[in-house]
Structures are given as C-alpha cells and as structure tokens.
Amino acid sequence: MTQLLDDNIVMTQAMSFLPYKKPFEERIAKWEAQLSLVSSTLEAWIAVQRNWTYLEPIFGSPDIMEQLPLEGKRFATVDRTWRKTLAATERAPGVLAACASPKLLESFVECNKLLDSVQKGLSDYLETKRLAFARFFFLSTDELLQILSQTKDPLAVQPHLRKCFEAIERLTFAQDLAISAMTSREGEVMPFDKEMYPKVRLGIGSLGHK
C-alpha cells in the first residue's frame, strides 16, 4: 500500500512539470496535497500501531499500572483514541476515507508523543529496578517485565532464576508461597534456616544472602 501511494505521489509531482498542466493545475495541487496528507497519516498510524502493540500487554497488567500510574494514564489516553479510530475505520474502510482528515494526523502525532513519554518512563523504571538489584541486568527487558507484571505471584521468578543466580536451579515453595529451600543445578537441596515470604519486587534480592 505504501509503495503504491509513493508511486502515485511521484506521478502526481511529475504532472506538475508538464507543459500542458495549466487547465489541471488546481486539481493536481489538490490531489498532491491529499496524497501527502494520506502518506503522513499512514506513517504516523503505523508508528502508533507498532508502539501500542508492544505496550498494550504491558499496561494490561494491573501491577504495572500500579507501579507506573502516570505512564498508565497516558497509555490509557492513547488506547481510547486508538480503539475509537479502529472502530471508525471498520465503519468506513478505505485508505482515502480513513486518512483524509488532518485531525486524524494531529491525533496520531499527539499519540506518538504520549507513547514516546510512556516508553521513556518505562525504560527509566526498569533501570531503577536493575540498579536496585544488579542481577536484573542479566535479564532481557521482556523477562524483567514478566516478573514485574506479576509482583503478587512469587512463582513468577522461577523461570528466570538461573539467569539471576548461577548456582540456583529452582526454589521450593510451600502452599502459603513461603520459600523454604533452594535446589542447585547439581540437584542438591539447601533448606533455609528461616522461611521467606517474599514480594517479587523486593524479596528476590534476599536470595543472594542465603
């Protein structure tokens, strides 16, 4: 679609240099302006879609919304605009019909600004978590987000323990989710002197002192 649009823009611009353009000059200029608007709108649209698709499952987590309330509100604003736009597009499909309004481009530009600020806030937040617990640097961004989006579930750390602690294969959880022991990669079980009742955001660091 974008290639076809670019081709049409090039052809329209070429028409403006034809010697016999005079009778059609106004129509050519109008058509070129419309194609340019559609191109800019599609570019902004794709950017919103890409960023929204990445952030939607992250801010779909109540834990992340609780930890990043400002970014959560900004994302919610974009989410409403995005879903409203999709609904309108379903009612009136077609590129020209969907992208002919300058207001839509302005809306997408604003959405992209908000999404950029959300991304920055999220990156800064993850950096503070890594600085507070250096072993989080061993995890990818997606892996760290998996943990932080399930802060009420201590079991969420289990798949990532080997990256954070070379010697730990898994933890032993009681029914009340207290941690009573850890198992090494060699299969050796090491009971704790005292059971731990961790919160994911705070308690994982205590393992380094056991």
Question: What function would you assign to each model-found segment?
Answer:
Residues 1-210:
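Extended amphipathic alpha-helical elements
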